[in-house]
Structure formats: structure tokens, C-alpha cells
């Protein structure tokens, strides 16, 4: 038997069919029985084999191996993750853009067609209506005499971009474009989801309601790992959200959650919904349950509310609000509140934080930062943000920046203050506020190698003094720092020489309170010093080509600045520079502008590099040492030490190697003039091709008064996939000085096609804690996270913790979870 094949404009579908059958001017032709406008083989649908699980046969037809020809031609964004054995392939690709109904051409085939002008008209037998971006299959299609109502029955399939449904029957109102499907099984390729509904009702072109329905993103099987069952599921393409009523969440056949209302995403837009809940136990909080709720309030702002139950403390609420304005920048506000903390003397615990950045135009920008906490233990006890740091001093600042308009000119105006959380901290250890600070830097171009530079740092420093006895050592006032420099940059492929001459000055003016508290007169209520400086940086570059490129660069650096007495000058914000290879070739011993160094020294060094043909630096090594021709008399705290009177520094060595593009090792060591090692470290990083990562580091510093604090610690971390879906990960920081692990974390993560589970244990001290203090206890916690993929956004705290502690984890984690 030959099938009839019609081609016509479709608007709406059934009305156009019967307009044609009434004798319209459209063209018709015949097609062979195997002629089809759809590329999907529907053979299995014709076999009518009833299985124990209804719909299984339908689902299996469209769930294919990723190596199949159908999957190979799909956009990879539509394919399921590597954790799935197969992927959904619907008749029409998710990337297909359907032609508007009133402009599209349709092809209709059927075994039999009958037109009745006074009654119902019919298409019967292998009916296929294939439009540009849509298709319908059925055993029979009927339309009433008024061409208002259409009915399709018998293995009915509807397909459009990435969506497919099979039903026993479809009723459709052609005028309102509303209809319903009976006993339907559906597939959403883009969401990797499928399910069943007793009724699917299309209430508008963009909204569908499923009644007595199921939903899962697991592979098709008789008992999926999880599924939603709901009295009603509403899918809205305008909002990109799905909502449910009277919903139960099943794991296998066990109901684990029942909610009257649930909201979940149906596309990749940011949308309101529940994020991954967390459940855990800690030794200082007991049982803990956290259920974050994401609120997509508008395209340019959103919020997250996080109710948190801590059995030994109480009920806490944390929140975060993010915003993006059209003309005034973007920012974030977050905080938390725990009333009557049962583990903290029934005190209210709270914090508040604000970050705002605004690029006013190409030249001006500004930002605001504000942090507040009720007590020094808040971050350690209650803050779950992995980015948070246990700082003793919380920063509050406003900054206005200027750059780019005038070449070489940058400027900054800043107001900065701090909240010192520990009320027992002495005035000496509190930071100064800058009320305000103005920074200006201007560097000219480099015509013929000649360059000029000007720097200004003007600030008013103020500190709140609790103990009047500290007024003499903690003065307030205005400090003005200026630097004028001229340098000549001589550079060739084989050598460089950079002489520089500069003059620097500090002018300090005590404020009226300091003058009165110290009883200063007009002769000593201000301090001024001017110091000229000369430096010369020279080097030779030897290069040898071949299979490997080798370079050797011997370098000499000389600096001279006369001594100017600065005894009694205040120290508002200056610290000693760290000891490293690059510091050998700098004339500045201090970070900050409260001291002007006296210098008369020569540094000698040599560096070596070896590059392979791929550009990897297989070896980089440097060694250097400074030789002093005079004692360094300007000190930070007006005290002398043996370092400032030694004739030379100890040698400093730096070495690193990219053994491969995934494996790097590095080591540094610095000695003092007496032969003692001042500091040394060793680090190695390896990132594999399969989501594995290994980091190891050791860091040791000798205590040098007024220069550096003692530190002796090792850090190690790893991420190791096991089989295809499992991976273990860990991180440890061990303090050898106190013989204690300051932090260790061990977790396991399982990723499947439709769900993920993370379980981890963590033990840690506050960064400010002294483990030897008998009143300080280690904090221990065990947490579990589960994600049902397709039900909400990701909120993986384990991943966030490791991102902030493990170099390279963010990159391998993205490649693992999104593969």
C-alpha cells in the first residue's frame, strides 16, 4: 500500500490538514511506505510488547550509547556527563530553532485519509506530520466539523527541540492552542530527564502542567535511584522553572522527603530553588543541618537564605544578597545571626559584611569594603564561608582610584579602619586607621631609555588608645612621603644596565591630641628627613641555542644612600622586607614609608634557565649574596642587631623545575651571615590527566626579632579518582613547632549520572589559636552532602574548602564534574 504525502503551510496543524483535504490549492504527492520526514526509527513502538514497567520500551529506544552515530552528531552540550552509561537522543535536536507555525512547511503521511464536511474528518494508519522543528506521530488523527478540536490516539508521539512525549491520546483546541495528553511518557534531552504523567496539559504556548507525574534525571530503569512523584508538576519555559505540589522524593522505593511545594530548574538560568542541603556533626556544635534557599529576585540581583540548625547552639540564619546595577557597580552583602548561643554564654552571635565595586568610567573606579563580627571566635565557630579568614582585625575601607586617562599617572584616595576582635590585644598591636590616605604615582614613558618617576603617599594615621600609658609610643598624625627618581634603561639582547638617582623625603606632623598628650612644643611636634639615593642594576645575558635553549645571567646590584637619623620617628604601617632572592636586588629594606634606608652594599648573583623545545622551563636556578660596606643604622624599632652590623648576608638560593607540563618542583633557601639558615622551603605540584592532583610543601622560618616569626610546617594535599565514579581527597597542615596538625581534612566523593554524594571529616584550629593553650580545643566535624542532579543548584562545601587550600583543585574539579 502506498502512503499519501502532503506538503503545506501549517497554522495551526490540524486546521491546515483539513483545509488541504477540502480541496485547497496546496500540492500533494505520494510517497513510498518507507519514506519518512523523521530520521528516528520507530520500529520498536510498533511491536506492542507490554513490559512490567510501562514506558520502558519507549525510553530505551531513545537512550543510546555515546559512541552511537546519533550521539556523535549531537552538540556535546546536550550529551549527558561521563558518569552516565548513555545519553538521550530525541528526534529533534535541542539546538533546532523551530520555524514559526504560520511560516513553516509541513509534510503529512498516512495510510488512509477521509474528509467529511458535515462531521469528523480522519487521518489513519502510521500518521506522521513532520514540520520544520516539530513532529507528530499517531495511529489516528481526527478533527471535528468546526475545525476547533483535534484528537490523536494510538501510540501518539509529539517532538520538538530536545523534547519528546508519547501518549495514548491527545486532545487539542486549535483556537486556544491548549490541549492535554493522556497516560504520557516524556523525555527532556537537555535536562537528561524523563518521567510519566497520567495527564499532560498545555495551558499556554510556554506552560505545561503534568498531573500525577514522576520526574527523574537517572538513566531509564525500572527503579531509578531517585524520582519525584507529585500530584502536579508545572513547567514554565518563560521562567525556566518547574514547580510541584504534594511532592514526595523517593530513593529507590523509599520515600525520604515529602513537601507540599517544591521548585527546581528546567534550564541553565539562575532560578529560585533549594540548594544542596548539608548534614553533619561537630564536637563543638553537635548535629548540624543546613538547607540553603536560593532566591532569583531579578535578573540583576539575587539572594540566598540559609536556615541552619546547630543542636548544641541553636537555630541560626545566614543570608547573602548580590546585586548588579546599571550605572553604579555591583556588590555583595552577607551576614548571619544566632541568638542566645548555648555554647557561648547565651550571647547573641552575628556578623555583617559588605563588598561593592563600581567602575565609574574608563578612568575612575571605587570600591567599599566593610566587615563586622560580634566576637573573635565567630568565624571559627559559625562562619561556613570557605573564603573567610580568621583575621584578628576586620577591615572597613572606601577607595577611589584613577588611572588610564593620563599615560603613566595613577592615583588613589582611601579611608581605612579596622575592628579589632580580641579586646585583650594591646594598643601596640592594633593597626592604625588611615583617615584618609592619598597615593599618587607618575611614571613617564621610556624615550631613548630615559625615565622619570614621582611617588607621593600622604596619610593621616589615627589609633584608638585604651591605655593612656601607650600615648607616648602610639602617636597620631599626618605623614607625607615623596620620591623623585630618574633612571636610564639600557637594554640589549646581551646586557642591561639601569642606573637610578632619587631623592626621598618624609614629613610627619603630630595631631593636636598627640601634641597635648606628649607635651610637645613647636620645635618637636613635627619631624622631617630627606635622603638621596643611588642604585645601579647591571647584568649580562649569555644564551646558547640548540635542542634546549640555555641562558645564564650574572647580575650585580649596587645601592648607596647616606645615613639620616630617624630615631623617635613613629612607625605607622611599616614592616621589614622578607628574605628572598629578588630582595637582594632591591634598595628597600622596609615595606612602608616610615623609614628611609641608609645603604652602601653590593649584591652579586647569577641565574640559569633551561628551556625545552616546547617552551617548558625545565630548570631555573639562582644564587646570590649581598656585601655591605657600612652598618645599617636605620632600623624599624630603633634597636640594633647583628644582622645590621654584619659585613655580608648569607647566600640565597632559588631553584625550580617544570619536569613536565603537569609536574613542577621548587625550592628556596636563605642563610644568615653566621651560617644559620634563616628560612627554607620546598614545594612540588602534580596535576594528572584524569582528575588526580598531588601537592606537597615544607616551610621553615627562623625567629628573627622585628623581622620574621618562627614557622615550621608541612602542607600536603591530594585528589585521587578511584575507578570511574569515586575519588578521595585530603589536605593536611602540620605544625612541627607545636607537634600538632593544625588542620586535616579527608573526604570521599561519588559522582553518578543523576546524583552525587560527598562525605568528609575535618579537624582544625583557629588560625589565631595557640594549640598549647589548655583553654583551646581542636574543632572536629563530619559533614555529608548529597546532590540530586536536576533538582537544584550546586552548593558543594567540600569543593569550596579545597579550592581555597589546594593549588589547582578548582581546575581539576571542573573538568571532573563537567566531563
Curated annotation (Swiss-Prot):
Gene3D superfamilies: Lipopolysaccharide (LPS) transport protein A like domain. InterPro entries: LipoPS_assembly_LptD, LptD, LptD_C, OstA-like_N. GO terms for biological process: Gram-negative-bacterium-type cell outer membrane assembly; lipopolysaccharide transport. The keyword Thylakoid does not apply. Pfam families: LptD (PF04453), LptD_N (PF03968). Component of the lipopolysaccharide transport and assembly complex. Interacts with LptE and LptA. It is found in: Cell outer membrane. GO terms for cellular component: cell outer membrane; transporter complex. Keywords: Cell outer membrane, Membrane, Signal. It comes from Acinetobacter baylyi (strain ATCC 33305 / BD413 / ADP1). This is LPS-assembly protein LptD.
Amino acid at each position: 500500500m502506498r502512503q499519501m504525502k502532503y506538503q503545506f503551510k501549517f497554522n495551526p496543524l490540524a486546521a491546515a490538514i483539513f483545509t488541504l483535504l477540502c480541496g485547497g490549492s496546496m500540492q500533494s504527492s505520494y510517497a513510498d511506505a518507507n519514506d519518512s520526514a523523521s530520521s528516528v526509527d520507530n520500529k520498536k513502538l510498533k511491536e506492542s510488547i507490554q513490559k512490567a514497567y510501562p514506558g520502558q520500551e519507549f525510553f530505551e529506544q531513545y537512550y543510546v550509547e555515546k559512541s552511537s552515530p546519533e550521539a556523535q552528531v549531537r552538540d556535546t552540550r546536550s550529551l549527558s556527563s561521563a558518569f552516565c552509561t548513555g545519553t538521550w537522543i530525541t528526534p529533534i535536536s535541542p539546538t533546532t530553532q523551530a520555524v514559526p507555525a504560520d511560516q513553516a512547511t509541513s509534510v503529512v503521511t498516512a495510510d488512509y485519509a477521509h474528509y467529511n464536511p458535515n462531521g469528523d474528518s480522519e487521518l489513519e494508519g502510521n500518521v506522521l506530520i513532520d514540520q520544520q522543528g516539530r513532529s507528530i506521530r499517531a495511529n489516528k488523527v481526527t478533527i471535528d466539523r468546526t475545525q476547533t478540536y483535534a484528537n490523536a490516539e494510538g501510540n501518539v508521539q509529539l517532538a520538538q527541540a530536545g523534547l519528546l512525549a508519547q501518549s495514548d491520546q491527545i486532545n487539542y483546541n486549535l483556537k486556544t492552542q491548549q490541549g492535554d495528553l493522556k497516560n504520557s511518557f516524556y523525555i527532556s534531552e537537555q535536562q537528561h530527564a524523563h518521567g510519566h504523567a497520567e495527564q499532560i496539559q498545555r495551558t499556554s504556548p510556554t506552560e505545561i502542567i503534568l498531573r500525577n507525574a514522576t520526574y527523574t534525571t537517572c538513566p531509564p530503569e525500572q527503579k531509578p535511584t531517585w524520582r519525584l512523584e507529585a500530584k502536579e508538576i508545572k513547567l514554565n519555559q518563560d521562567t525556566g522553572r518547574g514547580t510541584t505540589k504534594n511532592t514526595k522524593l523517593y530513593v529507590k522505593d523509599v520515600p525520604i522527603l515529602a513537601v507540599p511545594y517544591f521548585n527546581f530548574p528546567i534550564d541553565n538560568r539562575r532560578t529560585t530553588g533549594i540548594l544542596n542541603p548539608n548534614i553533619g556533626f561537630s564536637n563543638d556544635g553537635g548535629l548540624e543541618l543546613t538547607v540553603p534557599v536560593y532566591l532569583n529576585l531579578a535578573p540583576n540581583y539575587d539572594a540566598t537564605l540559609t536556615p541552619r540548625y546547630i543542636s548544641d547552639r541553636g537555630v541560626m540564619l545566614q543570608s547573602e544578597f548580590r546585586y548588579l546595577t546599571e550605572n553604579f557597580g555591583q556588590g555583595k552583602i552577607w551576614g548571619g545571626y544566632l541568638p542566645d548561643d548555648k555554647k557561648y554564654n547565651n550571647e547573641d552571635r552575628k556578623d555583617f559584611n559588605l563588598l561593592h565595586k563600581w567602575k565609574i568610567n574608563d578612568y575612575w573606579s571605587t570600591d567599599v569594603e566593610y566587615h563586622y563580627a560580634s566576637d573573635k571566635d565567630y568565624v571559627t565557630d559559625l562562619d561556613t564561608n570557605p573564603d573567610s579568614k580568621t583575621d584578628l582585625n576586620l577591615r572597613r575601607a572606601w577607595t577611589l582610584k584613577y588611572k588610564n586617562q593620563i599615560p603613566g599617572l595613577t592615583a588613589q584616595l582611601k579611608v581605612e579602619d579596622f575592628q579589632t576582635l580580641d579586646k585583650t590585644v594591646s594598643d601596640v598591636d592594633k593597626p592604625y586607621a588611615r583617615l584618609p590616605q592619598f597615593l599618587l604615582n607618575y611614571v613617564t614613558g621610556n624615550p631613548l631609555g630615559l625615565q622619570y618617576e614621582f611617588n607621593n603617599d600622604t596619610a593621616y594615621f589615627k589609633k584608638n588608645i585604651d591605655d593612656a600609658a601607650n600615648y607616648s609610643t602610639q602617636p597620631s598624625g599626618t605623614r607625607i612621603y615623596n620620591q623623585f627618581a630618574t633612571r636610564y634603561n639600557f637594554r640589549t639582547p646581551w646586557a642591561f644596565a639601569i642606573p637610578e638617582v632619587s631623592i626621598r623625603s618624609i614629613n610627619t606632623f603630630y595631631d593636636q591630641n598627640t601634641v597635648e598628650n606628649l607635651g610637645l612644643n613647636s620645635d618637636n611636634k613635627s619631624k622631617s628627613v630627606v635622603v638621596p639615593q643611588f642604585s645601579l642594576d647591571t647584568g649580562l645575558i649569555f644564551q646558547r641555542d640548540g635542542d634546549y635553549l640555555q641562558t645564564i645571567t650574572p647580575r650585580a646590584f649596587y645601592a648607596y644612600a647616606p645615613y639620616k637619623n630617624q630615631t623617635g620617628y613613629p612607625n605607622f604601617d611599616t614592616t621589614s622586607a622578607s628574605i628572598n632572592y629578588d630582595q637582594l636586588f632591591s634598595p628597600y629594606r622596609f615595606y612602608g614609608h616610615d623609614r628611609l634606608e641608609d645603604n652602601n652594599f653590593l649584591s652579586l648573583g647569577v641565574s640559569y634557565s633551561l628551556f625545552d623545545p616546547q617552551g617548558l622551563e625545565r630548570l631555573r636556578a639562582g644564587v646570590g649574596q649581598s656585601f655591605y660596606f657600612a652598618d645599617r643604622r636605620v632600623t624599624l624599632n630603633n634597636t640594633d642587631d647583628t644582622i645590621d652590623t654584619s659585613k655580608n648576608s648569607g647566600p640565597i638560593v632559588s631553584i625550580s623545575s617544570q619536569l613536565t607540563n603537569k609536574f613542577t618542583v621548587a625550592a628556596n633557601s636563605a642563610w644568615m651571615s653566621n651560617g644559620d639558615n634563616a628560612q627554607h622551603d620546598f614545594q612540588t605540584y602534580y596535576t594528572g590527566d584524569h582528575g588526580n592532583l598531588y601537592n606537597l610543601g615544607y616551610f621553615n622560618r627562623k625567629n628573627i626579632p622585628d623581622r620574621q616569626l618562627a614557622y615550621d610546617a608541612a602542607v600536603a594535599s591530594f585528589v585521587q579518582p578511584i575507578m570511574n565514579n569515586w575519588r578521595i581527597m585530603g589536605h593536611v597542615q602540620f605544625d612541627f613547632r607545636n607537634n600538632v596538625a593544625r588542620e586535616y581534612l579527608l573526604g570521599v566523593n561519588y559522582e553518578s549520572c543523576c546524583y552525587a554524594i560527598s562525605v568528609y571529616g575535618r579537624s582544625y584550629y583557629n588560625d589565631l589559636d595557640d594549640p598549647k593553650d589548655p583553654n583551646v580545643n581542636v574543632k572536629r566535624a563530619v559533614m555529608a552532602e548529597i546532590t540530586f542532579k536536576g533538582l537544584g543548584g550546586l552548593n558543594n562545601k567540600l569543593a569550596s574548602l579545597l579550592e581555597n587550600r589546594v593549588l589547582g583543585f578548582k581546575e581539576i574539579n571542573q573538568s571532573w564534574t563537567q566531563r
